[in-house]
């Protein structure tokens, strides 16, 4: 029986699931928006939100905790220098999941997961203004 077990299995072993979610979290922090299946996006949100909460206060212990989960110095630096101060006044809900239809091969529901206060690139608008 499956009583009191949280999270999704996503048809993977636990080690594969953990490494996949770490890689997806790194991609989300790097690009600030990624496209994935809806269930993976919902599971990724459970991983990403506590990391952003830790990155709001820049202490050595918080840096070590975040590094133990992410394992990439460049992304940890970006979290504490750029993303943490950006989300300092927000109490939670750092990510947004937007449904974007179904995948053509197997009709799996797809979604974009993005950081809420991300800076959008408006290169087209800058070119049009010139």
UniProtKB/Swiss-Prot annotation:
Keyword Ribosomal protein among UniProt keywords: yes
Alphabetical list of Gene3D superfamilies matching this protein: Ribosomal protein L17
GO cellular component: cytosolic large ribosomal subunit
Pfam family membership, one: Ribosomal_L17
UniProt superkingdom: Bacteria
Assembly behavior: Part of the 50S ribosomal subunit. Contacts protein L32.
HAMAP family: Ribosomal_bL17
Protein family membership: Belongs to the bacterial ribosomal protein bL17 family.
Protein name: Large ribosomal subunit protein bL17
Lineage of source species: Bacteria, Pseudomonadati, Pseudomonadota, Gammaproteobacteria, Enterobacterales
């Amino acid at each position: 029986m499956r009583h009191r077990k949280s999270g999704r299995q996503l048809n993977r072993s636990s080690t594969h699931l953990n490494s996949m979610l770490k890689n997806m979290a790194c991609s989300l922090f790097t690009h600030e928006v990624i496209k994935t299946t809806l269930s993976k996006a919902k599971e990724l949100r459970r991983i990403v939100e506590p990391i952003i909460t830790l990155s709001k206060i820049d202490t050595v212990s918080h840096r070590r905790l975040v590094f133990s989960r992410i394992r990439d110095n460049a992304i940890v630096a970006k979290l504490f220098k750029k993303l943490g101060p950006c989300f300092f006044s927000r109490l939670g809900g750092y990510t947004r999941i937007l449904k974007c239809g179904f995948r053509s091969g197997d009709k799996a529901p797809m979604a974009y997961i993005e950081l809420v206060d991300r800076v959008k690139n408006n290169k087209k608008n800058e070119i049009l203004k010139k």
